[in-house]
Amino acid sequence: MHLLMSLFGVLAVMQQQLAVRAAAYIPDSDRNTKTLQNDLQVERDGNYRYAYETSNGISATQEGLGGVSVQGGSSYTSPEGSVISVSYVADETGYHPVGDHIPKVPDYILRALEYIRAHPYQVKDYYTGELKTVAHDAAAFNVYTRNIQDQTTPRSRPSSTPKTIYLTHPPTLSDAPTRRPLRQRQNDSRRR
């Protein structure tokens, strides 16, 4: 038992030493890194701009428009030696990164989105009972395909396609179908 406790103690000390060494590890390429450029401009209206670059190849720039939109980019060198670059725009439609290392949207997904956009469908209006044609908004479709490069581009929507229909109020109880009581089964002569 004493031997087992000693073994656990030695293992705990070794694990602690390895954790300290792993946390203190800094690759040789990063050990003597210098900041080559560091610029920051902040204006009273909320607009800002920053850029930095280090001697080990890491760089970033970003420009913000008063909390409404941001655009920028960054790059670094991967452990394999290739330069990884990302440029992006973030605005009311979301975050849109662009980079060679980011997977492209498969062609079959683009074709499916195009088919959905090009084929409006009909919905029965709950209140009036009439059929209304609903089309997908081209602007929403463009958000999905904004940053797709070297892929098929969506065709513009024909001007005859109707706009999206939105119902203006929630259903009320008077619009709901009426309830009917369930009929009770009569004694069936087959069941005995």
Curated annotation (Swiss-Prot):
GO terms for cellular component: chitin-based extracellular matrix. One of its GO terms (molecular function) is structural constituent of chitin-based larval cuticle. Residues 45-106 form the Chitin-binding type R&R domain. It comes from the Eukaryota. The keyword Signal applies. InterPro entries: CHIT_BIND_RR_consensus, Cuticle_Struct_Prot, Insect_cuticle. Keywords: Cuticle, Signal. Residues 149-192 are annotated as: Disordered. The keyword Signal applies. Residues 149-163 have a biased composition (Polar residues). Residues 1-15 form the signal peptide. Component of the cuticle of the pupa of fruit fly. PANTHER family: CUTICLE PROTEIN, CUTICULAR PROTEIN 65AU, ISOFORM A-RELATED. This is Pupal cuticle protein. It comes from Drosophila pseudoobscura pseudoobscura (Fruit fly). The lineage of its organism: Eukaryota, Metazoa, Ecdysozoa, Arthropoda, Hexapoda.
